[in-house]
């Protein structure tokens, strides 16, 4: 599955397919600093029942990124090209979608713009964006400062990034050292550009579109991630055919902190009425 990130760029997005492509497909979209590798342990548990497609988003993993065209259009161009490749793929039936954080924001835009492509979706620790242009401008300015830190001292940035309270439960988890090492595989210049082009400040708000949702969605949030618990509650109130699952004792990275529970909830939801 070859995906280009922009109508003005031929940069391919790297993907990895886990198992037979004739099985029902689940598309997995990772968060900022991650890659498709984040989903491999989960995909391996699902390989007897699903073809798991692990996407490296622009500027992450093996996917390059180029700053061609209007930066305000890049987010939705990424959404559009993902949808185009999915609609052109050999399997005609709708697929399942899972997105975390940055990948969750992209996934939510995909669902609302191209509902015919998807059977069900799980959105993890993500939001429909910022409601006002003033908020988006402020966020772009903040993200620019973060991008410069990435470019100046990548290792120092990674250390400081995971000092944030929303990652406290991950940092105390046995998996943290592995996660930290995987983050450092990424190219810092690409990550900085990805933040500038795919950050929340560049994302068009989809709050007003939630009421038009046509795809069954489960929103996941960690109990300790209070910001996204509240966002999840707000989304469920606006979004038809949706529900919120709160993961006890977990923070922002609940799919890493409690993979067993995540897999259980995913299979329950995707297998229901299959």
Task: Show where each model-derived region lies.
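Conserved HGGG/HGGXW glycine-rich cap/lid loop of the alpha/beta-hydrolase fold
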Residues: 16-65
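Catalytic histidine neighborhood in serine/cysteine hydrolases
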Residues: 236-252
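Flexible "cap/lid" loop of the alpha/beta hydrolase fold
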Residues: 112, 120-150
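Gly/Ala-rich beta-loop-alpha elbow adjacent to hydrolase catalytic centers
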Residues: 99-103, 107
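Active-site loop/oxyanion-hole signature of alpha/beta-hydrolase fold enzymes
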Residues: 40-44, 53-98, 264
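Catalytic histidine-centered segment of alpha/beta-hydrolase-like enzymes
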Residues: 250-259, 263
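Alpha/beta-hydrolase fold catalytic core
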Residues: 1-27, 47-51, 86, 91-92, ...
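Conserved serine/cysteine hydrolase catalytic core
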Residues: 184, 189-234
């Amino acid at each position: 599955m070859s995906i280009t990130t922009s109508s003005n760029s031929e940069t391919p997005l790297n993907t990895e397919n886990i198992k037979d492509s004739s099985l029902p497909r689940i598309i997995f979209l990772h968060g900022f600093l991650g890659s498709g590798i984040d989903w491999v342990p989960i995909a391996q548990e699902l390989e007897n029942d699903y073809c798991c497609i692990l996407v490296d988003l622009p500027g992450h993993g093996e996917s390059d990124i180029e700053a061609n065209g209007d930066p305000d259009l890049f987010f939705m161009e990424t959404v559009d090209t993902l949808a185009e490749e999915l609609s052109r793929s050999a399997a005609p039936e709708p697929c399942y979608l899972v997105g975390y954080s940055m990948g969750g924001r992209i996934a939510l835009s995909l669902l609302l713009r191209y509902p015919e492509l998807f059977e069900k979706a799980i959105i993890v620790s993500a939001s429909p964006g910022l409601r006002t242009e003033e908020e988006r401008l402020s966020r772009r300015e903040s993200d620019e400062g973060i991008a410069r830190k990435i470019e100046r001292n990548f290792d120092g940035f990674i250390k400081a990034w995971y000092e944030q309270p929303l990652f406290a439960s991950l940092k105390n988890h046995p998996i943290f050292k592995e996660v930290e090492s995987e983050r450092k595989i990424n190219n810092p210049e690409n990550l900085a550009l990805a933040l500038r082009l795919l950050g929340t400040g560049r994302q068009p708000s989809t709050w007003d579109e939630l009421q038009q949702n046509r795809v069954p969605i489960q929103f996941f949030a960690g109990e300790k991630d209070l910001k996204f618990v509240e966002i999840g509650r707000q989304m469920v109130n606006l979004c038809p055919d949706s529900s919120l699952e709160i993961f006890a004792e977990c923070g922002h990275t609940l799919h890493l902190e409690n993979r067993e529970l995540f897999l259980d909830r995913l299979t329950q939801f995707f297998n229901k009425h299959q």
